Amino acid sequence: MTSLLDQLSSMTVVVADTGDLEAIRTFKPQDATTNPSLILAAAQIPAYQNLIDKSLQASRQRVGSFASAKEVVDEALDEVCVTFGKEILKIIPGRVSTEVDARLSFNTQATINKARKIIDLYKKVDISKERVLIKVASTWEGIKAAEVLESEGIHCNLTLLFGFSQAVACAEAGVTLISPFVGRILDWYKAETGKDSYAGEEDPGVVSVTKIFNYYKSNNYKTEVMGASFRNIDEILELAGCDLLTIAPKFLEQLENSDSKLTRKLDSLKPLPSETKIHLEEYDFRNMLKLDRMATEKLEEGIINFSKAIEQLEQLLSKRLSYIESGSNAELSIA
């Protein structure tokens, strides 16, 4: 019998949601996604300490011997993400998503500048921009930054997407791909309603992605939909046929170990009837987002949590830099 993972791969691009190189080797996905939390976790795996050290050493060389430790760490944040991205691209045939500093989520020009820098770092290690997706938070400022970047041929993955207004604005901006967060939407509704579980197609995250998918396909938008942040296998199965799904290793393993029959739920060639095309000015976007309490709260929470992960990564890099430059060889940890 064919595994669920193989069946899913025949109708959806399967993406690994991890920075763990061994997990990526195991499941052989088409693409891979990273975020600050995943890079932080991977950076603390002893097997990858050499990648961190190389990133810090390259950053020190770039900023100069007289630069402060803070300047080295600031430079190394991007270097580390690109280093992991480069290693991931040695394994997968497709694209890797690398995220812009979440602390820039409300600054359009700073986001553009950071994205250009990341692409330049990839270029220096002979990675084409065609193999990189720049992850940007789906704020108005982030979406406008992505619109500029796309016009320059820099492809963007708009993340932390929870509401329909965000999806509409992303499509209008012509971004390459969006990542609606299925599981985090479910988390909010469970906390809000006190309901412990939702059956498959009634899962609020599944409902949201299905609505967005059908809206995009019915209105002939080129922006792809990549479901993300899953809490259980049922959410994944209910979105079979979505353009892409980015899946954590623990769920990839479950899919690989099951040979149940998979039914396509979404079809880009046969989308279900959807709303007619909507145009959003900035005021409309902000008003729709404000009225969607779930999307507003989860977007804010996501930016805060990713920002905290970046700060923890900074601490880890600072600690490691001091060890390297003092000749020590202690293992990495944020403790």
From Swiss-Prot:
Cellular location of this protein?
A: Cytoplasm
Q: Which UniProt keywords apply?
A: Cytoplasm, Pentose shunt, Schiff base, Transferase
The protein's matches in SUPFAM superfamilies, at most eight in alphabetical order, are given as: Aldolase
The positions flagged as active site in the entry are 135 (schiff-base intermediate with substrate)
Any one cellular component term from GO for this entry?
cytoplasm
Can you provide one Gene Ontology molecular function annotated for this UniProt record? transaldolase activity
Catalytic reaction equation(s):
D-sedoheptulose 7-phosphate + D-glyceraldehyde 3-phosphate = D-erythrose 4-phosphate + beta-D-fructose 6-phosphate
Question: What InterPro entries has UniProt attached to this entry?
Answer: Aldolase_TIM (IPR013785), TAL/FSA (IPR001585), Transaldolase_1 (IPR004730), Transaldolase_AS (IPR018225)
**What EC number is given for this enzyme?**
2.2.1.2
Name of the top EC class for this enzyme:
transferase
* One of the GO BP terms on file: carbohydrate metabolic process
Copy the pathway line from the protein's UniProt record: Carbohydrate degradation; pentose phosphate pathway; D-glyceraldehyde 3-phosphate and beta-D-fructose 6-phosphate from D-ribose 5-phosphate and D-xylulose 5-phosphate (non-oxidative stage): step 2/3
Tell me its family.
Belongs to the transaldolase family. Type 1 subfamily.
Function summary: Transaldolase is important for the balance of metabolites in the pentose-phosphate pathway.
Q: Tell me, how does this one assemble?
A: Homodimer.
Q: What is this protein called?
A: Transaldolase
Question: Which source organism?
Answer: Prochlorococcus marinus (strain SARG / CCMP1375 / SS120)
The organism's taxonomy opens as: Bacteria, Bacillati, Cyanobacteriota, Cyanophyceae, Synechococcales
